Amino acid sequence: PMYPNATRQSPEAKASPKTIKSLQAMQELYEKDDWAGVISKADELGGMASANAYDKAFAYSMAGNAAANMNDQAKAATYFGKAVDANGLDNDSHYATMYNLAIIQYGEEKYADALATIDRFLAETKSGKADQLAFRAGVLAGLNRNDEAAAIYKDLINKNPTDKRLLMNGVAALQGAEKFDDANKLLEQAYQRGMLTEPRELRALYIGYMNAQRWTEAQKVVDDGVAKGILQPGPELARDYQILAQTAYANDNMPLAIAMYKRAAPMAADGEAYLNLAKVLDMDGKKAEAKAAAKSALDKGIKKPEDAKRILAR
C-alpha cells in the first residue's frame, strides 16, 4: 500500500452483483471517450438502491476523471468530492482521489477548500512526502499566509537542497512574506552550488541584490551570467544594466555608471541608454566620448533628440 500508516481501515472494495453490468457499461463509455455518457451513468448508478459504497465511489471517481477530461474542473471537483464522501474505495484509490480533489480546488483558486482537503489528506494518511508538503505550502501562499508557507519551504529546502522547483517556490513565498533577505540567502546558496542555470533564476538573484542595494554583487551575477551564456544580450538585460548604471550614478560612482551604460547601450531597444551614457560622460569631462555616444543615441532613436543635439553642439 502507498499509505501504510493511514488511520482509515481500507474497506473490502467489491462491486455489488446487481451493479456490475452498469459499471462495465460505464467503463466501455470511458474507453470510447464518451465523457458525458460516463457522467450520466455515474449519476444513475449513484441513485440505485442496490449500489454499495464501492459502486458509488468508483462511479463518481470515474465521472470526476471524465469531467476533468472535458476541462470542466468545477464538475470534476464535485464528483471527486462525492467519491471521497462515498468512502468505498481502497486506501490507495481513496487518497489518490482526495489528493486530486485538493489539486483541482487549488487550480480553481478555492484555496480554503484546498487547504481543508490537503489537511485532511495529511492527517489521515500520516504521509509527509516533500511534494505533498510543498503543495500545502503553495495553498497557504494562495491564502496569503506567506509566513507559514515560507516556514514549510525553508524546512523542505534544508532536507532537499538540490530540488530547484522547491527552491524557486520557496523564494516566491519568502518574497510574498516580505522576507527579502531570507529569499536572497536561499538564492545565494543555490547560486554558489551552481543550481541557477536559467535567466529568470539569475534575474531573481540579481534583482534581489539590487533591491537590497548590494550593487557589486548584482553586477558580478550579471557579468557571470553573460560570460556563461545564460543571460543573452537584449532589451531586458539592457534594462537591468541601466538600473545598475543609474544606481552607480546616484551613489557618485561615475566609472561604474559609465561601464554599465556602455554595456546596456548596444543591446537596448532604443537610444536612451546611449543618451544617458553621453550625459554621464559629459559630466565626467569626457567630451569626445560624450559626443560619440550622443550621435549613437540619435541614430538609434530617442524621445528628446534636442538633449543629444545639445551635447553635440558643445
List PLM regions with ranges.
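N-terminal leader/linker segments that initiate helical-solenoid repeat arrays
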Residues: 1-81, 90-96, 303, 309
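Generic helix N-cap/helix-start motif at coil->alpha-helix transitions
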Residues: 15-24, 53-60, 90-99, 125-135, ...
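C-terminal soluble interaction/assembly domains
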Residues: 243-246, 250-314
